[in-house]
Amino acid sequence: VTASSDPKFFSNGLDLDWITSKGDHEGGDRRVFGDEAMKLFARLITFPIPTIAAVNGHAFGAGFMWALCHDQRVMRRDRGMMCANEIEIGVPIPEAELALFHHKLPRHAFYETVQFAKRWTGEEAFSSGFVQELADQDEVTSKAIERAEELSRLGANRELFKWQKEHIWGSDAAINRTDGPAHMLHNNGDYPHPPRSG
Protein backbone atom coordinates (compact mmCIF):
# COMPACT_ATOMS: atom_id res chain seq x y z
CA VAL A 1 0.00 0.00 0.00
CA THR A 2 1.25 3.45 -0.91
CA ALA A 3 -0.22 6.22 1.23
CA SER A 4 0.47 9.86 2.02
CA SER A 5 0.58 11.50 5.43
CA ASP A 6 -0.64 14.78 3.93
CA PRO A 7 -4.43 15.03 4.30
CA LYS A 8 -4.79 17.12 1.13
CA PHE A 9 -2.34 15.51 -1.33
CA PHE A 10 -1.56 11.95 -2.37
CA SER A 11 1.17 13.34 -4.63
CA ASN A 12 1.38 16.61 -6.50
CA GLY A 13 3.88 15.12 -8.94
CA LEU A 14 7.30 16.48 -9.73
CA ASP A 15 8.87 19.62 -8.31
CA LEU A 16 8.85 21.67 -11.52
CA ASP A 17 10.92 24.49 -10.01
CA TRP A 18 13.69 22.01 -9.25
CA ILE A 19 13.48 20.31 -12.64
CA THR A 20 13.57 23.57 -14.61
CA SER A 21 16.14 25.43 -12.46
CA LYS A 22 19.65 26.02 -13.79
CA GLY A 23 22.99 24.92 -12.35
CA ASP A 24 23.87 22.40 -9.67
CA HIS A 25 21.26 21.66 -7.09
CA GLU A 26 21.34 20.02 -3.67
CA GLY A 27 18.45 17.79 -4.77
CA GLY A 28 20.73 15.84 -7.09
CA ASP A 29 21.46 15.42 -10.77
CA ARG A 30 18.42 16.49 -12.78
CA ARG A 31 19.86 15.06 -16.01
CA VAL A 32 19.22 11.48 -14.90
CA PHE A 33 16.13 12.11 -12.82
CA GLY A 34 13.51 11.63 -15.57
CA ASP A 35 14.82 8.25 -16.69
CA GLU A 36 15.31 7.09 -13.10
CA ALA A 37 11.74 8.10 -12.18
CA MET A 38 10.39 6.22 -15.21
CA LYS A 39 12.34 3.10 -14.14
CA LEU A 40 10.77 3.35 -10.69
CA PHE A 41 7.31 3.50 -12.31
CA ALA A 42 8.23 0.48 -14.47
CA ARG A 43 9.24 -1.46 -11.36
CA LEU A 44 5.97 -0.68 -9.61
CA ILE A 45 3.73 -1.58 -12.57
CA THR A 46 5.33 -5.06 -12.68
CA PHE A 47 5.90 -5.50 -8.93
CA PRO A 48 5.48 -9.19 -8.00
CA ILE A 49 2.76 -8.67 -5.39
CA PRO A 50 -0.56 -6.78 -5.46
CA THR A 51 -0.13 -3.02 -5.01
CA ILE A 52 -2.79 -0.57 -3.81
CA ALA A 53 -2.68 3.24 -3.89
CA ALA A 54 -4.51 4.97 -1.03
CA VAL A 55 -5.36 8.20 -2.87
CA ASN A 56 -6.36 10.42 0.05
CA GLY A 57 -6.17 13.71 -1.85
CA HIS A 58 -4.95 15.30 -5.07
CA ALA A 59 -2.84 13.21 -7.47
CA PHE A 60 -1.57 15.46 -10.25
CA GLY A 61 0.99 14.90 -13.02
CA ALA A 62 3.49 12.26 -11.96
CA GLY A 63 1.39 11.71 -8.82
CA PHE A 64 -1.48 10.54 -11.03
CA MET A 65 0.96 8.41 -12.98
CA TRP A 66 2.28 6.89 -9.72
CA ALA A 67 -1.26 6.04 -8.61
CA LEU A 68 -1.99 4.37 -11.97
CA CYS A 69 1.13 2.19 -11.68
CA HIS A 70 -0.54 0.41 -8.76
CA ASP A 71 -2.81 -2.57 -9.41
CA GLN A 72 -5.76 -0.89 -7.71
CA ARG A 73 -6.71 2.47 -6.25
CA VAL A 74 -8.85 3.45 -3.25
CA MET A 75 -9.73 7.14 -3.48
CA ARG A 76 -11.22 9.66 -1.13
CA ARG A 77 -14.91 10.09 -1.84
CA ASP A 78 -15.47 13.77 -1.05
CA ARG A 79 -12.31 15.67 -2.03
CA GLY A 80 -9.24 15.32 -4.14
CA MET A 81 -8.78 14.99 -7.86
CA MET A 82 -6.60 13.06 -10.27
CA CYS A 83 -5.27 15.02 -13.22
CA ALA A 84 -2.53 14.93 -15.83
CA ASN A 85 -2.25 18.70 -16.12
CA GLU A 86 0.91 18.78 -18.23
CA ILE A 87 -0.80 20.41 -21.22
CA GLU A 88 -2.06 23.24 -19.00
CA ILE A 89 1.39 24.05 -17.67
CA GLY A 90 3.26 23.61 -20.95
CA VAL A 91 5.03 20.36 -20.12
CA PRO A 92 4.90 17.64 -22.80
CA ILE A 93 3.85 14.15 -21.75
CA PRO A 94 6.62 11.67 -22.65
CA GLU A 95 5.66 8.71 -24.82
CA ALA A 96 6.25 6.27 -21.97
CA GLU A 97 3.78 8.15 -19.78
CA LEU A 98 1.27 8.29 -22.64
CA ALA A 99 1.62 4.51 -22.98
CA LEU A 100 0.89 4.09 -19.27
CA PHE A 101 -2.21 6.29 -19.46
CA HIS A 102 -3.33 4.49 -22.64
CA HIS A 103 -3.05 1.06 -21.06
CA LYS A 104 -4.41 1.89 -17.60
CA LEU A 105 -7.32 4.19 -18.47
CA PRO A 106 -10.51 3.39 -20.39
CA ARG A 107 -10.41 4.88 -23.90
CA HIS A 108 -12.75 7.81 -23.15
CA ALA A 109 -10.85 8.64 -19.96
CA PHE A 110 -7.48 8.48 -21.73
CA TYR A 111 -8.34 11.22 -24.22
CA GLU A 112 -10.04 13.42 -21.62
CA THR A 113 -7.00 13.00 -19.37
CA VAL A 114 -4.12 13.71 -21.74
CA GLN A 115 -5.67 16.14 -24.20
CA PHE A 116 -7.98 18.15 -21.96
CA ALA A 117 -6.32 17.80 -18.52
CA LYS A 118 -9.60 16.60 -17.00
CA ARG A 119 -9.71 16.81 -13.24
CA TRP A 120 -11.24 13.50 -12.14
CA THR A 121 -13.14 13.50 -8.86
CA GLY A 122 -13.28 10.28 -6.89
CA GLU A 123 -16.84 9.60 -8.05
CA GLU A 124 -15.90 10.18 -11.72
CA ALA A 125 -12.76 8.04 -11.49
CA PHE A 126 -14.77 5.25 -9.83
CA SER A 127 -17.54 5.47 -12.45
CA SER A 128 -14.93 5.39 -15.22
CA GLY A 129 -13.35 2.27 -13.75
CA PHE A 130 -9.81 3.32 -12.87
CA VAL A 131 -10.55 3.67 -9.15
CA GLN A 132 -11.81 0.46 -7.58
CA GLU A 133 -13.20 1.79 -4.28
CA LEU A 134 -14.23 5.08 -2.68
CA ALA A 135 -13.85 5.84 1.03
CA ASP A 136 -14.30 8.65 3.50
CA GLN A 137 -11.20 10.69 4.35
CA ASP A 138 -10.40 8.85 7.57
CA GLU A 139 -10.88 5.43 5.97
CA VAL A 140 -8.91 5.66 2.71
CA THR A 141 -5.74 4.05 4.05
CA SER A 142 -7.54 1.43 6.15
CA LYS A 143 -9.71 0.45 3.16
CA ALA A 144 -6.56 0.18 1.00
CA ILE A 145 -4.94 -2.05 3.63
CA GLU A 146 -8.09 -4.23 3.78
CA ARG A 147 -8.00 -4.56 -0.01
CA ALA A 148 -4.29 -5.42 0.08
CA GLU A 149 -4.93 -8.09 2.71
CA GLU A 150 -7.70 -9.58 0.54
CA LEU A 151 -5.41 -9.69 -2.50
CA SER A 152 -2.21 -10.72 -0.69
CA ARG A 153 -2.81 -14.42 -1.35
CA LEU A 154 -2.29 -13.70 -5.06
CA GLY A 155 1.31 -12.68 -4.39
CA ALA A 156 2.21 -16.06 -2.86
CA ASN A 157 3.73 -17.08 -6.19
CA ARG A 158 5.61 -13.87 -6.96
CA GLU A 159 7.19 -15.11 -10.16
CA LEU A 160 3.80 -16.00 -11.63
CA PHE A 161 2.16 -12.80 -10.37
CA LYS A 162 4.86 -10.67 -12.00
CA TRP A 163 4.72 -12.71 -15.24
CA GLN A 164 0.96 -12.23 -15.37
CA LYS A 165 1.31 -8.45 -14.97
CA GLU A 166 3.91 -8.35 -17.71
CA HIS A 167 1.52 -10.09 -20.10
CA ILE A 168 -1.64 -8.12 -19.39
CA TRP A 169 -0.97 -4.45 -20.07
CA GLY A 170 0.79 -4.21 -23.43
CA SER A 171 -1.18 -3.52 -26.61
CA ASP A 172 0.46 -6.66 -27.98
CA ALA A 173 -0.63 -8.63 -24.87
CA ALA A 174 2.82 -8.41 -23.30
CA ILE A 175 3.68 -5.44 -21.13
CA ASN A 176 7.42 -5.61 -21.75
CA ARG A 177 7.36 -5.73 -25.53
CA THR A 178 8.51 -2.56 -27.21
CA ASP A 179 5.06 -0.98 -27.24
CA GLY A 180 4.10 -1.87 -23.67
CA PRO A 181 4.23 0.76 -20.92
CA ALA A 182 6.66 -1.09 -18.63
CA HIS A 183 9.19 -1.43 -21.44
CA MET A 184 8.73 2.19 -22.46
CA LEU A 185 8.99 3.46 -18.86
CA HIS A 186 12.15 1.44 -18.28
CA ASN A 187 13.68 2.59 -21.58
CA ASN A 188 12.30 6.13 -21.69
CA GLY A 189 15.50 7.52 -23.25
CA ASP A 190 14.99 5.38 -26.36
CA TYR A 191 11.81 7.19 -27.37
CA PRO A 192 11.39 10.59 -29.05
CA HIS A 193 10.89 13.42 -26.62
CA PRO A 194 8.28 16.08 -27.39
CA PRO A 195 9.32 19.71 -27.81
CA ARG A 196 9.80 21.81 -24.72
CA SER A 197 7.53 24.79 -24.41
CA GLY A 198 8.72 28.32 -23.82
Predicted feature residues:
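Short, active-site-adjacent cap segments at secondary-structure transitions
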Residues: 7-11, 60-61, 168
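Hydrophobic/aromatic residues within transmembrane alpha-helices
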Residues: 2, 15, 66-68, 125, ...
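C-terminal long alpha-helix characteristic of the crotonase
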Residues: 75-80, 126-179
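Well-ordered beta-strand positions
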Residues: 72, 112, 116-118, 124, ...
